[in-house]
């Protein structure tokens, strides 16, 4: 329709010229056709032309109207969802929608989200939709309906249009394939059903703000639990709008367990679904989660909900793993069994992170994050605050809850500094740019090779280190009177609690990076524009030692004892018999030697290597050595030499300052123990 669009544009131009009172200076007067007419006849000609083309434009717009352009009806639709799982082994969820139309309409568009709140990449959930049907009237299940089917047109990759002329209600049905245990996706099998709503439920375009109901019919003896379950055996829910409904992940199984506790009059439910050995650790898990809740509410104050649910799954495999925040719940997927000490520690780490999102992201949020446009990624410049600061506080809250000691907490921050400072992308990509690159970094899949390992850095650790630095600088600048804790509470109050509703979804309008810089400057008592310009918008290394000195600590750097030399090579993480190169650092000796991504390293210095031994083989050589490499590339064996330059991997370690003052030690104690100014 490019020609039709151009004609409409020319018509608008001619109409605008006519409205301005032009007397013959038309854009088309150079046309041989137009020059035959006198000025008056030409004016009449254009009136007829405009009318004819406008009619054509209107017809084209009706036939090709994009779904997103549909305006919201002044009268809400009545929308009811039903979810069934008649054959769990098929991995197919059955979704039915009853839609009552208060006024006649030519069509109804239904859309599947391209992405899900809490994730920032496009996942195109519509790819798992099948057997879409629609009939006139309210009729469930649709397979047994005698009513006539309604015409359906697939408008685009995520939109189905149902013609509704002559009907005041319709029933839509479709199936969704789900076999991924994840906070992002859905899984249905013989053991259980678990879903994230964005993967399962379509919405009526233009009617996301409308109230909706949901009824779930589970298989026999399966029980339902989510963050909005208010009674035993509940199967029906009412939600104020679609966005709240899909923000309610749900577990349906015969064998989940629930333990409860209360903090400051709020009820918390720890729901555990295990596929592996628990080793008797569930009571300890519940106690430790309560300690996390107490530490985080001590900083923020009481949350606005009455009840909150931790949905925790132990997948007992190496494939599953995720954590996702929601308004009244979180979903935590852990590979491995609860009985494993490492899995247990990782679970608490994820819980601390996700529960902090109750305030930071789910309520206090960048201005772009809610309500959502599910036709495109929610691009925001603020994920280094929303996610990176949450990373920082997740670790700090484990310390304040007594689940990490000082040494372990500082070791974690040291490791984060080591990871970021050794990443080549840290010198090329700012925290703000990383936030905008989230669709490429947030587990988005692509078959196209990229150079992101050399050019990108995650907003999680980048933001975490900015939070650490900013927190300690504010504490030092204000002599402990204020902190980043105080900044976050001020932001929460100004941009959520006291901010008028900006939409149907939640109160608050959200904040910009500039809003955050202003509030931080007010709390610190100094203008922090230079800090944010250099370290958030820019790529300079944050002033770690200046910040750490306020709490009697210092940052030391030394060549890595384990792998001082990598020659600029990063290996694939997947287990393979031989080391496989994932990326080559730009300007490295490996790049100079002609090594490529995808090369399989067979030997180093004539010594056969494995992923476990390759660094030891490389580290036998000294700086300046010309090391023989044998690699396999495209079924060819290639030999080359890599000259080792200066050490390219460093270890960073936060340590006690020998001259730490009593004042700095007092500031450190307030920082680590959460003393509230």
Describe every region a protein language model picked out.
Residues 85-86, 118-189:
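A surface-exposed beta-strand-loop module
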Residues 93-126, 199-219:
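Surface-exposed beta-strand/loop patches in extracellular or lumenal glycoproteins
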Residues 95-101, 112, 156-190, 212-220, ...:
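Short, hydrophobic/aromatic-enriched beta-strand segments in well-ordered soluble domains
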Residues 125-128, 200, 209-229, 240-244, ...:
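Zn2+-dependent metallopeptidase catalytic core
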